[in-house]
Design a protein with these regions (language model features):
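Mature extracytoplasmic/periplasmic domains
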Residues: 155, 166-191
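Conserved functional loop/turn residues at catalytic and ligand-binding sites
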Residues: 26, 90, 132
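Short helices/loops that flank or line small-molecule/ion binding pockets
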Residues: 34, 59, 63, 80-94, ...
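Well-formed, non-transmembrane alpha-helical positions, independent of function
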Residues: 29, 84-85, 100, 127, ...
Length: 214
C-alpha cells in the first residue's frame, strides 16, 4: 500500500529443469527417485526459501504426494548460480521461471512447467498437469508508482505499457522468454494483486528443508 499499482505486464510460468545428461526424463522420474531415496534429490533455486523458485518445486512435490517440507532446497543468490549448481551436479533439479531457462536449453531439459497447457513458444515442453501433477502457477511482473502519483500520470504510463506490448520488438523479447502477456491496468491490476496475495499466503506452510550455499 506504500506504492501505486499501475499495470501488470507479463506472466512467467514456473519450470523444473534437469541437466541434459540427467537420467530424469520427466517429473515422474524425479518423484520416483525421491521416494526411493529422499537424499538423492536436491532442488536448486535462485532465491531464498518461501520465494517463487522454492514454491514452484515445493508445490510440485506436494502434488506428487511427497512431503515438501522434507525436500532439500538449496538457495543460490542468483538464477545463474543456481543453474551452475545444477550443471555441476551439486543439485539434481532446478526450480525456476520458464524464462530463466529458455536461453539455456542447450544445457538443460525442461521436464515440467506450471502452465495449464503447453505454451506455443515452447511446444515440446510438457506441463506438470499433463503428467498427473495439477500445479498451475504464474509469476507475474508489473509496474508501480510512488505514493501520491496522480491519476493522470498513472493512466499515461499504463497506456504506454499497453502500447509497448503491441510492438514487434516487445513480441520478440516475449517470445524468446516464453512469457505470456497479462496486461491489466489500474483497477484490474489491483484485483489481480488481491487474488495473488491470497494464493501466496496459502502457500506459507511449505517449508522445504534448506541448505545454504555460500
Amino acid at each position: 500500500k506504500d506504492v501505486v499499482p499501475i499495470a501488470g505486464v507479463i506472466g512467467d510460468y514456473g519450470a523444473i529443469a534437469v541437466a541434459k545428461n540427467s537420467p530424469y526424463k520427466n517429473f515422474k522420474d524425479v518423484v520416483a527417485a525421491y521416494k526411493a531415496n529422499p537424499k538423492s534429490v536436491k532442488m536448486a533455486g535462485g532465491s531464498v526459501r518461501g520465494s517463487m523458485d522454492h514454491l514452484i518445486g515445493a508445490l510440485a512435490f506436494q502434488e506428487a504426494g511427497a512431503d515438501p517440507n522434507k525436500v532439500v532446497y538449496i538457495p543460490y543468490d542468483a538464477g545463474g548460480k543456481a543453474l551452475a549448481g545444477l550443471l555441476s551436479g551439486e543439485t539434481q533439479i532446478l526450480s525456476t521461471g520458464l524464462g530463466e531457462v529458455m536461453g539455456a536449453r542447450d544445457q538443460v531439459r525442461i521436464i515440467g512447467i506450471t502452465a495449464p497447457k503447453r505454451v506455443s513458444d515452447a511446444p515440446d515442453v510438457p506441463t506438470l498437469k499433463e503428467q498427473g501433477f495439477d500445479v498451475q502457477f504464474v509469476n507475474w511482473r508489473g509496474f508501480f508508482g510512488p505514493p501520491g502519483m496522480s491519476s493522470g500520470d498513472k493512466k499515461k504510463i499504463a497506456k504506454m505499457l499497453g502500447d509497448v506490448q503491441k510492438t514487434p520488438e516487445w513480441e520478440a523479447v516475449r517470445k524468446r522468454n516464453a512469457w505470456v502477456n497479462i496486461y491489466n491496468p489500474d483497477k484490474k491490476f489491483v484485483k489481480f494483486l488481491q487474488t495473488q496475495t491470497k494464493e501466496t499466503v496459502s502457500y506459507t506452510h511449505l517449508r522445504a528443508h534448506e541448505t545454504t550455499v555460500y
